[in-house]
């Protein structure tokens, strides 16, 4: 009985090993570069696009649908012309998608609805904060002082810096 069970265990381990990978498509790209960022080619299109700052999962699905790409398809399986189409669409700031899906609505200078990605988003957010500081809005003043901006409590939470400790009265 001992030998028979040992043989079964061995065969179970062999059965648990994953099957050898099938021959991969020669055109498969393991790294796809979009908006100056390397994306993992083994991920589905919306998930890979969500690695870009400024594009979430929902926007990734919307972009795939807009470009007639199958959302379950891996981004590395796309042809060169499809990748170029995707690059142009992502790097274009004005999307033909619903306004609520975009991250920079009613831009102050032009009034357009934009979706910014990567460094464009970082630069624009910093410019918006500097504008608030310049016009001395409540939020701008809070930013200047390094306080919380969105109405959170400041008395008990969010403390940082060195603790002062308790000072005793001198007798």
Curated annotation (Swiss-Prot):
Keywords: Ribonucleoprotein, Ribosomal protein, RNA-binding, rRNA-binding. InterPro entries: Rbsml_uS13_C, Ribosomal_uS13, Ribosomal_uS13-like_H2TH, Ribosomal_uS13_archaeal, Ribosomal_uS13_CS. Pfam families: Ribosomal_S13 (PF00416). GO terms for biological process: translation. Residues 1-22, 142-171 are annotated as: Disordered. One of its GO terms (cellular component) is small ribosomal subunit. Residues 10-22 have a biased composition (Basic and acidic residues). One of its GO terms (molecular function) is rRNA binding. Part of the 30S ribosomal subunit. Forms a loose heterodimer with protein S19. Forms two bridges to the 50S subunit in the 70S ribosome. Belongs to the universal ribosomal protein uS13 family. Located at the top of the head of the 30S subunit, it contacts several helices of the 16S rRNA. In the 70S ribosome it contacts the 23S rRNA (bridge B1a) and protein L5 of the 50S subunit (bridge B1b), connecting the 2 subunits; these bridges are implicated in subunit movement. This is Small ribosomal subunit protein uS13. It comes from Thermoplasma volcanium (strain ATCC 51530 / DSM 4299 / JCM 9571 / NBRC 15438 / GSS1).
């Amino acid at each position: 009985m001992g030998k028979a069970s040992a043989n079964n265990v061995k065969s179970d381990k062999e059965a648990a090993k994953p099957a050898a990978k099938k021959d991969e498509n020669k055109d498969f790209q393991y790294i796809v570069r979009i908006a100056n960022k390397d994306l993992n080619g083994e991920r589905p299109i919306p998930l890979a696009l969500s690695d870009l700052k400024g594009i979430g999962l929902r926007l990734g699905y919307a972009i795939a649908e807009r470009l007639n790409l199958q959302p379950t398809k891996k981004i590395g399986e796309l042809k060169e012309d499809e990748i170029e189409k995707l690059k142009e669409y992502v790097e274009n700031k004005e999307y033909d998608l619903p306004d609520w899906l975009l991250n920079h609505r009613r831009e102050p200078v032009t009034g357009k609805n934009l979706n910014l990605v990567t460094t464009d988003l970082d630069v624009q957010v910093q410019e918006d904060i500097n504008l608030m500081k310049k016009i001395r809005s409540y939020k701008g003043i809070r930013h200047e002082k390094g306080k919380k901006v969105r109405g959170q409590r400041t008395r008990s939470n969010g403390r940082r810096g060195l603790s002062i400790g308790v000072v005793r009265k001198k007798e």
